[in-house]
A protein has these predicted regions:
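Residue-level signature of outer-membrane beta-barrel architecture
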Residues: 42-48, 96-98, 151, 165, ...
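Outer-membrane beta-barrel domain signature, strongest for Gram-negative TonB-dependent receptors
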Residues: 1-106, 110-115, 284-286
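Membrane-embedded beta-barrel scaffold of Gram-negative outer-membrane proteins
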Residues: 62-75, 185, 193, 225-315
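Transmembrane beta-strands of outer-membrane beta-barrel pores
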Residues: 2-4, 69-73, 112-118, 163-169, ...
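Surface-exposed extracellular loop regions of Gram-negative outer-membrane beta-barrel proteins
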Residues: 58-79, 137-183, 334, 339-350
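Gram-negative outer-membrane beta-barrel transporters
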Residues: 287-303, 307-405, 480-482
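C-terminal beta-signal and adjacent terminal beta-strands/loops
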Residues: 396-403, 426-484
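Repeated loop/turn-to-beta-strand initiation elements of outer-membrane beta-barrel proteins
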Residues: 47-63, 102-106, 156-159, 189-192, ...
Length: 484
């Protein structure tokens, strides 16, 4: 649970905020999450085993059944915006793993995924003479089958090829997703990995973009360029006796979800890439490792929460326009002396998406609030038997593009580059680990993280543009018990 808001705001003040927002009431927000999970798995060996004399080991084919139930409830309000969602999910999976030999194996299975979602969203923005009340209830059931073949040569080569097909009842479509992975030990110290796979994901647009509720904007589930052509949408008065009486509301003819139901929430993306790892000697034999990674995710359909089209609105829509993310990463690890480890990493991200513009065109822009690069250096030293462990980390966070608040992309700015430092000391005493540490040692904080904070009940209010730490220097201490 999390309660926040203006100074001295309490949960008991919510009703006053709802009714007297225009009379100086305090702004507040609260998120309550509840989750219940149950899991069952049964497996048994079947058929004869395969024996490898070199490995002195036996593998048995097996069959397994897995059942998983998850219930997640989230209730949240941000000022006048109110969200209530319950997700009940049941997953059933039956699989058979067959070993032809130590080198060849095949996994086949069938799976069903049942999901029942009860969601409602109230987005009153009386300062814009508009509001939205949305019923987002839906049932998403999916059944499918899959197969995965693995070929392995110990310490040399591993090849995995898989495919699955799923029918989704909500979209009334059949989806095929092939995937592959290869690992090749070119030499004992040089390893090449590669993978590629097509993926689909049905998005939960509110919980995936919960930050849109922390604004004073009007939310619409439709492309801004198509808004005027929406035949199902109608405008009408709110109940005059409501807290926001007299203002108009954006409703739809089917009871509040017409535009939402027309939204194609099924994202489609292809991810491909690989890595090259080299183990080498600096001081003692094979004491260092250097690896290079590159992965690209190409979106063929993506869901966008666009707050840059208009200063008063947030448009949530699907787009098949150009959208991708390229990630480059270099990792270096070295143990120059016994019990002293050095780890360094650098990651560069080029993430772009296409958004609609008011003149009817589109623009390929840098994805907002995604750091262009991150660098990290970690030093760790432990005494004999790990009685003392000293850990220091330095982190450099690169700039990210901040979404424009005016609707004009020329007004978009970049966040600054900033460092972060962390330190921890651990003392081992028997089965106990006693530790003390400090986070954000330099006490770096984002300045003015809330836009238009002095007028929270307005379209200009926005507390979702967060690119840096909000908490300053933090000291902590703790105790761990090791039972094994």
């Amino acid at each position: 649970n999390r309660l926040s808001g203006q100074n001295h705001y309490k949960a008991s003040m919510r009703e006053e905020m709802d009714t007297d927002w225009d009379k100086g009431a305090m702004y507040g927000s609260q998120i309550k999450n509840r989750e219940l999970n149950a899991y069952f798995k049964f497996g048994m060996p079947v058929g004869p085993g395969v024996y490898d004399e070199d490995q002195q080991d036996e593998l048995r084919s097996n069959i397994a059944f897995v059942a998983d139930y998850d219930r997640f409830r989230e209730r949240a309000y941000f000022g006048l915006n109110d969200y209530d969602g319950t997700d009940n999910m049941v997953s059933l999976n039956m699989m058979y793993n067959h070993y032809f030999s130590f080198r060849h194996s095949l996994i086949v299975g069938v799976q069903s995924h049942l999901q029942f979602l009860d969601e409602s969203l109230l987005n009153p923005t009386p300062w814009l003479d508009a509001a939205g009340a949305w019923n987002l209830d839906r049932q998403e059931n999916e059944v499918g089958a899959y197969a995965e073949y693995t070929y392995t040569i110990k310490d040399k080569l591993s090849v995995v090829a898989g495919i699955r097909g799923d029918y989704n009842g909500y979209y009334d479509k059949f989806y095929v997703t092939p995937r592959g992975h290869i690992k090749w030990n070119i030499t004992p110290t040089t390893i090449l990995r590669g993978s590629a796979g097509l993926g689909y994901r049905s998005t939960n647009v509110i919980t995936d973009n919960i930050g849109v509720l922390a604004t004073g904007r009007h939310i619409t589930f439709e492309r801004p360029t198509a808004l005027s052509a929406g035949a199902a949408a109608v405008r009408g008065p709110l109940n005059p006796g409501s807290a926001y009486g007299g203002y108009t509301t954006w409703m739809v003819a089917d009871g509040g979800a017409g535009n939402f139901k027309a939204l194609n929430r099924m994202e489609k993306a292809l991810t491909a890439g690989g890595s090259l790892t080299q183990i080498f000697t600096l001081v003692k034999e094979e004491d260092a490792t250097l690896s290079f990674d590159y992965f690209r995710t190409q979106f063929y359909n993506s869901v966008i929460a666009d707050q840059e089209y208009s200063p008063n609105d947030i448009y949530i829509y699907s787009s098949d326009k150009r959208s991708f993310t390229d990630t480059y990463q270099v990792d270096f690890s070295w143990t120059p002396v016994e019990r002293f480890d050095i780890f360094a990493t650098y990651r560069y991200t080029n993430s772009r998406m296409t958004i609609d513009r008011p003149d009817g065109s589109t623009a390929l822009v840098e994805r907002p609030l995604v750091s262009r690069y991150k660098a990290l250096l970690n030093l760790q030293y432990s005494t004999r038997y790990n009685r003392w462990v000293f850990d220091v980390t330095a982190q450099l966070n690169g700039p990210s593009r901040l979404p424009t608040q005016t609707g004009d992309l020329a007004d978009s700015e970049m966040s600054p580059t900033y460092p972060m430092f962390f330190a921890q000391v651990t003392r081992k005493v028997g089965k106990f680990d006693i530790y003390v540490g400090c986070e954000n040692i330099l006490d770096y904080k984002q300045k003015h993280p809330i836009l238009n904070a002095d007028d929270p009940f307005s379209a200009g209010f926005n507390s979702s543009v967060i690119w840096g730490p909000l908490m300053g220097r933090k000291f902590y201490a703790g105790l761990r018990i090791n039972f094994y």
